[in-house]
Amino acid sequence: MAACGEPGRPWQEEEAAAVVVVGSCMTDLVSLTSRLPKTGETIHGHEFFIGFGGKGANQCVQAARLGAKAAIVCKVGNDSFGNDYIENLKQNHISTEFTYQTRDAATGTASIIVNNEGQNIIVIVAGANLFLNSEDLKKAASVISRAKVMICQLEISPAASLEALTMARRSGVKTLFNPAPAMADLDPQFYTLSSIFCCNESEAEILTGHAVSDPTTAGKAAMILLERGCQVVVITLGASGCVILSQAEPVPKHIPTEAVKAVDTTGAGDSFVGALAFYLAYYPNLSLEEMLKRSNFIAAVSVQATGTQSSYPYKKDLPLALF
């Protein structure tokens, strides 16, 4: 595996990316309102903005802002949103060598409504993301095989995510799988191909059929997921932190986080995943528990500002103790 140097050092395109994401790019269309509308109701919002999102790109951007050499394998439309997105990735120092454009679909979009408490409802139209295919992945095999960590989600086709995970595992690359948006009938291979299986409470509910509302119920859901073949299961619980369970230590452990005033929780889970990937790649000797504590902290910073990627902190904005 190619050496990846020090986090945060400017890097050349020929250097191997330590964190590789195979996933989605979405243009966020965000409306801020005092409260969320009811069915059939029209309400006034007080602000609108267009931002950059998509679980894959979000996770990649957070890892890059912490100092990771990062690359993304994704597909956007051959349109203004797609062109703007490629420029956004470059500005975040993310390799776009395998960022493809297609004329067959528009760049993916996410329509987001956020209330005064920072709660949100989201509708995504995946668009070009679903056109990322096996041929695209094969072209990107060199960057996937040389990574230290590869992240996948489910905003691209499940078949593409499964193929990417298979490629990574075959090359000895650590895999971090975020099963979002969750599917009740998830292919069993996703569990066995994931070095770390990381989901939130609502995703854990869909996957297991059991209610998840606190660390205790999260631990029970994690046990079910572990029994399906995962090596490590992490269930995030928002303001309550997260729960971890592993084959090596099959007793659920709750890792709390600091209480903060949330302004906008959109993308907080992606901030957590991106931070975790950064620590897995650059601080492999840290305990997983410590990595999760630090990832909790970074995600908590992100909820204190509006927007998705716009809320993600840079290394320079964070305490030195995290590095």
Curated annotation (Swiss-Prot):
Binding site for substrate: M26, T27, D28, G54, K55, G56, A57, N58, E155, D270
Disulfide-bond pairs as recorded: none
Known catalytic reactions: D-ribose + ATP = D-ribose 5-phosphate + ADP + H(+)
Activation and inhibition: Activated by a monovalent cation that binds near, but not in, the active site. The most likely occupant of the site in vivo is potassium. Ion binding induces a conformational change that may alter substrate affinity. Competitively inhibited by phosphonoacetic acid, etidronate, 2-carboxethylphosphonic acid, N-(phosphonomethyl)glycine, N-(phosphonomethyl)iminodiacetic acid and clodronate.
Enzyme category, top tier: transferase
Cofactor needs: Mg(2+)
CDD domains in UniProt: ribokinase (cd01174)
Chief place of localization: cytoplasm
Cellular component, GO, one term: cytosol
InterPro entries for this protein: Carboh/pur_kinase_PfkB_CS, PfkB_dom, Ribo/fructo_kinase, Ribokinase, Ribokinase-like
Residues annotated as binding K(+): D264, T266, S302, A305, G307, S311
Domain of life: Eukaryota
EC numbers: 2.7.1.15
Pathway assignment: Carbohydrate metabolism; D-ribose degradation; D-ribose 5-phosphate from beta-D-ribopyranose: step 2/2
One MF annotation (Gene Ontology) recorded for this entry: ATP binding
Compartment(s): Cytoplasm; Nucleus
Active site: D270 (proton acceptor)
Functional description taken from the UniProt entry: Catalyzes the phosphorylation of ribose at O-5 in a reaction requiring ATP and magnesium. The resulting D-ribose-5-phosphate can then be used either for sythesis of nucleotides, histidine, and tryptophan, or as a component of the pentose phosphate pathway.
Family to which this protein belongs: Belongs to the carbohydrate kinase PfkB family. Ribokinase subfamily.
Name assigned to this protein: Ribokinase
Organism annotation: Mus musculus (Mouse)
